[in-house]
Amino acid sequence: MSYIVALTGGICSGKSVVAKKFSNLSKKVSVIDADVISKNITQPGSIALRMITKHFGPHILFSNGSLNRSMLKKIIFFNPKDKEWLEQLLHPLIRKETQKTINILSNRSSYILWVVPLLIENNLQKYADHILMIDVHVDIQLNRIISRDKIHKQYAENILLSQVSRQHRLNYADNVIENNKSIDGMTQHIHNLHRDYLKAEKTTTKKTIFSK
């Protein structure tokens, strides 16, 4: 198995941008994004989407049959039981697809960048060889959420409160990338980490990610 770097961070911390930076450094850096997998397994025609529609009703779909993710996020944010139901449905499917993808990519990857927004919240840190956190000041993060999602400040603040704190997340980090300014300011740090991960890949103990 390839060396697995778990990339995490709070909402609007810049995970996708940083992941893209890493993948651009080498074709042998494979990115596995938990959010992308979640979207793939809930496409029209999927078993997961049929179950979601049955549970929440047909109004959870757009007219073209695709999942209204924005509506779903709001529903589960204000309804803990619905959130728990959805997690029990999706998390095993996401883990299965993640492991399948890792098995496919391992032999042709120098290392795998595993992007997991809720790594700490879901206690998944134990499945990674290295944890890389993207840190951002709360006020900057708040402004990014409001701007991206077009929501009120109070709602954005509640979203932040629903995630683990910066400090709690930092306690698990092996390395931290600060994303408080321009993305270009992180380039050298990313290059240095990439070099370190290439070295680590040569000495890592191979394992199955969800076998612990």
Swiss-Prot record:
Record's InterPro entries? Answer: Depp_CoAkinase, P-loop_NTPase
Provide the reaction this enzyme catalyses: 3'-dephospho-CoA + ATP = ADP + CoA + H(+)
Pinpoint the DPCK domain residues: 4-204
EC number(s) given by UniProt? 2.7.1.24
Q: Kind of enzyme, top EC level?
A: transferase
List GO BP terms, alphabetically: coenzyme A biosynthetic process
Q: Name one GO molecular function term.
A: dephospho-CoA kinase activity
Which cellular component terms (GO) are annotated to the entry? cytoplasm
Q: Does the keyword ATP-binding apply?
A: yes
Ribosomal protein among the record's keywords?
no
Read off the Gene3D superfamilies from this record: P-loop containing nucleotide triphosphate hydrolases
Subcellular localization, per the record? Cytoplasm
Q: Which Pfam families match?
A: CoaE
* Residues bound to ATP: 12-17
- Keywords annotated in UniProt: ATP-binding, Coenzyme A biosynthesis, Cytoplasm, Kinase, Nucleotide-binding, Transferase
Pathway per its UniProt entry is:
Cofactor biosynthesis; coenzyme A biosynthesis; CoA from (R)-pantothenate: step 5/5
Describe the function of this protein: Catalyzes the phosphorylation of the 3'-hydroxyl group of dephosphocoenzyme A to form coenzyme A.
What NCBIfam families would the database entry show? dephospho-CoA kinase
The entry assigns this protein to a family as follows:
Belongs to the CoaE family.
Which protein are we looking at? Answer: Dephospho-CoA kinase
Instruction: Give the originating organism.
Output: Blochmanniella pennsylvanica (strain BPEN)
